Amino acid sequence: MATLLEGFEGGDTMFLARTTVELLRPVPLAPLVARVRLVRPGKKVQLVEASLWANGSPDDPAATEVVRAIGLRLRRGSADAHDLVQLAASVNADVDRRAAVQSEPGTGVLQEFEYDEGVGFGRRGFHAEAVELRFSKGAMQQQGPGTMWGRLLHPIVGTEPARGVPLAVALSDFGNAVSSVTDMDSWSFINADLTVSLHREPVGEWICLDAVTHVSNLGVGLASSALFDEKGPIGRAAATLLLEPRNP
C-alpha cells in the first residue's frame, strides 16, 4: 500500500510522512485490483487514498474491498535544515539512541521457526519466509517488550527490493509480534489497523523496531514501536489490536 501511495502522480516532490492502513476483510491469496486517487490536492499537503479489491475491479458489483490506506504526503523541503537537524539530534540524544545503541543492523539473534499444524508462528507465511528477523532484546513468543532488526528477503511489488518508506511500513506490522504479552496458543491478536509516521526517509535494507504492547479489559490492545534505521530514529508505528481467547 505504501508503494501505491508513494508512487501516485506527483509523488517525486512529496514525502509520504504518514501511512494508515485499514484491514477491512481477509486478503485472499489471489490477484487483486488496486485503485489510487487524490483525496486532498495541494502543493504542500496532500491526502492520497489507495484500496485493494478482490473478485474484480471497484466498479464490479461482485468485487470486495479488502484493504484501504490513506497517505499523508508533505512537500519535500527545499531549504537547508542541516543546523536544525543537528540541534534536534543533540537535544533528543538520550531518547533517540535508546534502542539503536544496543545493536547494529544485521546483528542479534536470528529468529527461526518450527512448522507445525498449530496457530500463529507455527504456520508457514510472510513472517517465516519473506523476512529475516534478528533480536537484540526479546524474541517471538517471548513475553514483554522487544527490539528487533528486520529486512525483506523478497520484493513486494514487481522485481525491485523494497526500500525507504515501503520497507518501513511493511516491517512496522511486526510491532505486536516483537512485544507480545501472552502466547498465541491462548489468545489471538488481530491487527485492526496500522499507522506509521515518519520524519525522514529510511535508508538501507534493515529497519529496527523497539516495541511494547499494552492491553485492557475491553479486549483491546495497542502495539507501539519506535522505528530506527542504520543512521538513527526515523519515526513511530502504532497498531490497534483486537484480543480474543482461542477455543480450547
Region locations from a protein language model:
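Terminal targeting signals and extreme-terminal segments of soluble enzymes
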Residues: 1-248
